[in-house]
Amino acid sequence: MLTIDHVTKTFGDYKAVDGLDLDIPEQQMFGLLGANGAGKTTTFRMILGLLSITEGSISWKGRPVNYHISNKIGYLPEERGLYPKMKVRDQLVYLARLKGMEKREAVKELGTWLERFNITDYENKKVEELSKGNQQKIQFISAVLHKPELLILDEPFSGLDPVNVELLKEAVISLKNSGVSILFSSHRMEHVEELCENLCILQKGKPVVQGKLKEIKRSFGKKNVTIHSDDDLRFLQSHEGILQWKETADGVKLQIANEDISQEIFAMLQGKGFIRKFELEEPSLHDIFIEKVGAVYE
C-alpha cells in the first residue's frame, strides 16, 4: 500500500500540497484529479523522491519512499522525456538498466511489449522518426519495462487515436490485475470513471472529494435525466426541480435536484407525445468535478 500521511509541501509562503492523506491499496487504480495547479504533479514528484516533503511522510508497503525503493516505481509524466536521437531499443534497455534490470531480461521484456503494441518494426528507429502516437507507446513502455510495483500515470492516453487508447487501456488493466498499484491522472473524466474505483479531487492542495467513485456519485444528490423525443419538451422547463437544461439532437438532457423529480417529470410527459427514451442516470464525474472545483479540467 502507498500511504501519504498528512503531507505538506511549501514553496516559500505558497502551499502546493496542504496536509494530504491518501491510502492507495495494492492491485488497484486510484484516480488523482484536479485543475492545473491543484498539487497533483507536486504529489507525484514527492512520491518519486524528486521533491522533498515539508511535513508528513510517504511510505510504500511500510517503508519510507526514498532512492532505495525508487526502482519499484514506474512514472509516465505528462511532459514527455524521450531522447529523440536515440534508437528505441537502445533507449528503453538503457532506462530499464538504470532501474536495476539485467540487460538480457530487459531485451526479452522489451520484445514482449513491442509485439503487444504492434511496433516491433520500430525497434531500431530513432524516436524522432516515429509518429506522436507511437512515441507515446514507447514512453509508456519506458515506465513499465522494469516491472514496477507502483505505477504513476499522468495523462497516459495523450496523443493516441481511439484504437490505440483501447490498446493502452487493456495494458493498464492487465498490469493492475497482475498486482501493480496504479496512481492515475487524466483530464478525460470518462477514462477515470472507467478505470478507477477510488479517487481524490484536489483543489489548492487539499482534497475536496475523496472515496469510492460509486459512493461519491450516490451522495452527490443531483441526477441526470435523458429524454429522446421529436416533440417540443420546453413545457418541462417550468418545473423548479430542473437545475440544468440542455437540448440535444435527440431531445434534452436535464440535471435534476434529486431522484424524486424524475418521477414528476415522467408524469408530466404522459399523453404529451411519443417518448423514445427516458433514462435516469447517476451524475457523471465531469458533473461532480465542475460542481466541486468550479472549473473545467484542463
Curated annotation (Swiss-Prot):
One of its GO terms (molecular function) is ATP hydrolysis activity. Keywords: ATP-binding, Cell membrane, Membrane, Nucleotide-binding, Transport. ATP binds at residues 34-41. It is found in: Cell membrane. It comes from the Bacteria. Residues 2-229 form the ABC transporter domain. It is a peripheral membrane protein. Coiled coil: none annotated. The keyword Cell membrane applies. Signal peptide: none annotated. PROSITE patterns: ABC_TRANSPORTER_1, ABC_TRANSPORTER_2. Pfam families: ABC_tran, DrrA1-3_C. Belongs to the ABC transporter superfamily. This is Uncharacterized ABC transporter ATP-binding protein YhaQ. The lineage of its organism: Bacteria, Bacillati, Bacillota, Bacilli, Bacillales.
